Design a protein with these regions (language model features):
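Aromatic-enriched
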Residues: 357-437
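Hydrophobic/aromatic-rich transmembrane helices and adjacent perimembrane loops
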Residues: 342-358, 406-407
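Structural signature of hydrophobic alpha-helical transmembrane segments
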Residues: 173, 202-203
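Generic transmembrane alpha-helix signature in multi-pass membrane proteins
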Residues: 110-111, 199-201, 212-215
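Primarily membrane-embedded glycan-assembly and transfer machineries that use lipid-linked glycans
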Residues: 2-196, 218-350, 426-427, 431-437
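Hydrophobic alpha-helical segments of integral membrane proteins
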Residues: 33, 202, 338, 356-357, ...
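Short basic/hydrophobic patches in alpha-helices and adjacent helix-turn junctions
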Residues: 67, 283, 334-339, 353-362, ...
Length: 437
């Protein structure tokens, strides 16, 4: 159970103005209504749940779960078998492109219960599980991020209309599992339970590219207990999958290559549809292999690594940031740098946004009035995040990929106001502590 959160008595919480409240609720409420109503109109015009769900990424997850559940785990990456299972699951409809299982084999073991269900029922159950995960996450993030009831309402509307979250729910993707894993790490870190933190982060192994920078941050922090717990959890997952499904890694990578060849640009590696530094470079140069493109990618990677080192290595020349702020910025650096990031994967930025919103609000109460405008700028840019993702989903301007440019701007402002964010006491930037039951 969770104890009610009481703001620290030494912190003067900033009251959100009514104008900002009404503007936020109106704008993001409208965007939420547009997104949800548009999907509902489309969904209601489908003759069945199967005809709706076969268009989404969940079909890939289901094929893997179905293969293991029906005793074909050793043939998990046999594309011919995957085609047969896909056609059987979506009958009487036929999907024109092969959309096979393209995730590590241990992830399919988690979904075996869904593989025992018909495709339509599995999609509905998975959607319900994801909604529960989102509700649990927001229940921990929103109350402690808001100073007033109005701010809680505004943050709820903003989070509910976050396009990566909506895409993850509709597509039936893995993002909520990764989100819950990251939240478990954050909560466990606050409780002083490093082993729980490492085990929680194992949930994000379904998309390991999303947690590379957080793992590097834990290593730079010398949080060996969390890393040991993570390594043990990862070892159990890998060992179990090898024991039950055979030596799958070589077959897995071969199947990925075959899927890319068969699906061409609609396949697994589509940089112009991504939202990371790689997509930023591709939008500018329309290639990833030219000299300027490679040079810019190298500069962005080195800058991200330099930022990571600055966050986690102590220095006498700069004050230390609270752990939660460092972790939030590490998450954003990781999303910017990862080579594979579609818009639905940006759902894991939710904790980062809330933690930075908290910290900047606390910092506003601790700096002189004349020095508050950069922090207000930071909060304004944070508030624009969901709108940027909404525009990125609907609009693809030439030479510009909105989300990575937005992340660079947000990170730049946060690093610029390092000294102000460092004023916040570590206990004042964190979500409500949990009690073991």
């Amino acid at each position: 159970m969770r104890l009610p959160f009481q703001p620290p008595p030494t912190v003067q919480h900033r009251v959100t103005g009514l104008k900002f409240f009404y503007l936020t609720v109106t704008v993001y409420g409208l965007l939420l209504c547009i997104a949800v109503s548009g999907w509902l109109v489309f969904a209601l015009h489908q003759p069945s749940i199967v005809s709706l769900a076969l268009r989404y990424d969940f079909l890939s997850l289901y094929i893997g779960a179905r293969a293991v559940a029906t005793g074909h785990g050793s043939q998990l990456y046999d594309l011919n078998l995957q085609r047969v299972m896909m056609n059987a699951a979506t009958a009487p409809y036929i999907r024109p492109l092969n959309f096979g299982y393209a995730y590590p084999a241990y992830a399919a073991l988690v979904l075996v219960p869904l593989g025992l269900l018909p495709f339509a029922a599995a999609y509905v159950v998975w959607l319900g599980c994801n909604l529960l995960g989102v509700g649990w996450t927001l229940r921990h993030l929103i109350p402690s991020s808001a100073a007033t009831k109005n701010e809680r309402i505004a943050l709820t509307v903003v989070a509910a209309g976050f396009v990566p979250l909506l895409l993850t729910l509709i597509q039936g993707q893995w993002g909520v599992v990764c989100l819950v894993g990251i939240m478990i790490l954050v909560l466990a870190r606050r409780r002083g339970a490093p082993y729980h933190a490492g085990i929680g982060l194992c949930l994000a192994l379904v998309k390991p590219q999303l947690i590379l920078f957080p793992l590097l941050g834990l290593a730079l922090e010398r949080n060996w207990r969390s890393l040991i717990a993570f390594a043990l959890g990862a070892g159990v997952a890998l060992g179990t999958s090898l024991l039950l499904l055979g030596n799958w890694p070589p077959v897995y990578f071969a199947a990925l290559g075959q899927l890319r060849e068969e699906n061409n640009v609609v396949g697994l590696d589509y940089p112009s549809a991504m939202h990371n530094s790689r997509a930023l470079v591709y939008a500018l140069f329309h290639t990833e292999t030219s000299g300027p493109a490679l040079a810019l990618q190298g500069v962005l990677l080195l800058a991200s690594l330099a930022g990571l080192l600055a966050l986690w290595l102590p220095s006498a020349r700069r004050p230390a940031l609270p752990w939660e702020v460092r972790f939030a910025l590490t998450l954003l650096l990781g999303l910017l740098t990862t080579p594979h990031l579609y818009l639905h994967d940006v759902i894991v930025a939710l904790p980062a946004g809330f933690l930075l919103w908290q910290a900047s609000g606390r910092a506003l109460d601790l700096v002189a009035t004349a020095r508050r405008w950069p922090l207000r700028l930071l909060r304004g840019v944070l508030a624009l995040g969901p709108a940027v993702c909404f525009c990125a989903q609907l609009w693809n301007p030439p030479f510009i990929q909105l989300v990575p440019w937005y992340m660079i701007l947000l990170l730049g402002i946060a690093f610029w106001k390092w000294s102000a964010l460092a004023l916040v006491a570590p206990g004042d930037t964190m979500i409500a502590p949990m009690v073991r039951v």
